[in-house]
Amino acid sequence: MCGQCGIILGKKRRTREELEALGNMFTELLKYNERRGRDATGIFVADQSGIGKILKAPVSAICLTESIEYQNAIQEIGNRAVALSGHT
């Protein structure tokens, strides 16, 4: 089995606090989906140009969300981001 989650942000200017809250919400969704798949986890952060950042690893969602790479990816979410997608 596997789990999928996502947040569609659309084009809107958000405050740093709003972006942080969205990042936290996405992290919780990803961890919640861990029960559907524990062997690997990946995320994709899409921006307005269609280019995005992919992060994946052969670890559980909880392990990935605790990594420096994940924390950096979530902190980099800015006003150009239009969607967050996760897979466990």
Regions found by a protein language model. Give the residues of each.
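N-terminal glutamine amidotransferase
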Residues: 1-88
